[in-house]
């Protein structure tokens, strides 16, 4: 899945150019940096590659979400609707701006169920945040229609779906704003990093300042900049941006390999009629970082996962239902409001509600789901061997369940 699997001299060259100048910060020091502006170059490359008018780099996908939420005017007491299956950072980002995360059931796209979203809208709802999990995408048209109907912002968390598209447009560029993560296990990586993309100039200007202590970047030097609003330090470094600049040039190479390997593994597992696959709203746009598949029952799925573990073939096959970081069932620290800084009353009330919320619709899907991460390093023979081992286990346990 991740770009770190295929390091090359291109990444080393970009990093060395930064080290040769000695200027690791993205802003200022115009003379000593000798014309090297890696963060600016990467932002331009993101806009060109994904078709966004503006891009603002940040230190992580989480800080990108936080920055985007603030730029969209989300704040204390506002409600943000997001899926119950997501990396915990999506939830944390909403809390970090004083807003209230509202989790809803997913469907077999593994992200927001539009019907569940409609039912969750209240007078306090400010934003809908689809999370394009595991390389694919939400039903963006349905969610955009809901946002338009209720005058809500659409913020795409595309941190896990770099390179995916929906009806010809890259995910992360369709809503009012979208975010990418470039951490170590994303399709392209900076080591750590993120980006906000938007086609709205005002949103971009706010992101640009908010991610750098409120600097308006209009002064002759940093000391002459004004600070029209509060901001924080969510800057990316030139070193991290340099790695990303090399990686984005190689994205098509990575996606081609991912899709080939994904297709080969899917063809093997498709031989088992009891297996069904994740619903992809636009199959041509799947970035293919994961192959997500379902078994008939939770009992059979758990038995398969346990046997994978026993046979040492579980690595890379994720059973999110028991995962501490990606599914709300394991988020007791959040549900209990275990924060080192006190949460506001509205947030505490929302967390209290979450503790008893019925998300059985999501449970029914996630308890039967396994996601197989797609490596860029696999050979055809390795995929064949892996797939056949997986298929053997699954068939054996399906048969055992049938004869009981």
Task: Please tell me what each predicted stretch does.
Residues 279-281, 288-298, 315, 319-337, ...:
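Conserved PLP-binding active-site segment of the aspartate aminotransferase-like
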Residues 70-158, 165:
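PLP-dependent aminotransferase-like
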Residues 207, 302-311, 387-390:
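Short amphipathic alpha-helices in soluble, non-transmembrane regions
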Residues 214-222, 264-269, 305-369, 401-404:
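Conserved PLP cofactor-binding pocket of PLP-dependent enzymes
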Residues 1-62, 66-70, 148, 366-367, ...:
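Conserved PLP-binding active-site segment in aminotransferase class I/II-type PLP enzymes
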Residues 29, 34, 161-167, 174-290:
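Active-site region of PLP-dependent enzymes
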């Amino acid at each position: 899945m991740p770009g770190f699997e295929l390091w090359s001299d291109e990444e080393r060259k970009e990093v060395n150019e930064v080290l040769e100048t000695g200027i690791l910060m993205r802003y200022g020091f115009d003379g000593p940096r000798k014309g090297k502006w890696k963060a600016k170059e990467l932002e331009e490359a993101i806009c060109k590659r994904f078709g966004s008018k503006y891009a603002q780099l940040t230190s992580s996908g989480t800080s990108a979400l936080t920055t985007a939420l603030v730029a969209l005017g989300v704040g204390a007491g506002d409600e943000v609707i997001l899926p119950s299956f997501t990396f915990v950072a999506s939830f944390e980002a909403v809390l970090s701006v004083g807003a209230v995360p509202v989790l809803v059931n997913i469907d077999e796209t593994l992200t927001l169920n539009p019907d569940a979203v409609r039912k969750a809208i209240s007078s306090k709802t400010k934003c809908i945040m689809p999370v394009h999990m595991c390389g694919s995408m939400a039903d963006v048209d349905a969610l955009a229609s809901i946002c338009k109907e209720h005058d809500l912002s659409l913020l795409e968390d595309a941190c896990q779906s770099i390179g995916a598209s929906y009806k010809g447009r890259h995910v992360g560029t369709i809503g009012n704003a979208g975010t990418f993560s470039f951490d170590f296990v994303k399709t392209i990586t900076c080591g750590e990093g993120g980006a906000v993309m938007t086609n709205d100039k005002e949103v971009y200007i706010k992101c640009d300042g908010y991610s750098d202590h409120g600097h308006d970047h209009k002064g002759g030097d940093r000391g002459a900049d004004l600070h029209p609003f509060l901001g924080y330090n969510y800057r990316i470094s030139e070193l991290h941006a340099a790695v990303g600049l090399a990686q984005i040039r190689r994205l098509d190479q990575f996606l081609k390999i991912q899709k080939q390997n994904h297709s080969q593994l899917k063809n093997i597992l498709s031989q088992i009629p009891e297996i069904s696959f994740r619903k992809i709203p636009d199959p041509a746009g799947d970035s293919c970082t994961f192959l997500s598949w379902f078994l008939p029952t939770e009992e059979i799925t758990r038995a398969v996962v346990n046997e994978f573990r026993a046979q040492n073939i579980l690595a890379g096959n994720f059973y999110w239902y028991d995962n501490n970081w990606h599914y709300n069932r394991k988020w007791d620290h959040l549900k209990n409001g275990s924060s080192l800084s006190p949460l506001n009353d509205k947030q505490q009330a929302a967390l209290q509600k979450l503790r008893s919320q019925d998300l059985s619709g999501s449970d029914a899907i996630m308890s039967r789901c396994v996601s197989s991460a797609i490596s860029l390093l696999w050979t055809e023979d390795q995929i064949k061997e892996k797939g056949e081992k997986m298929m053997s286990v699954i068939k054996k346990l399906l048969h055992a369940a049938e004869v009981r």
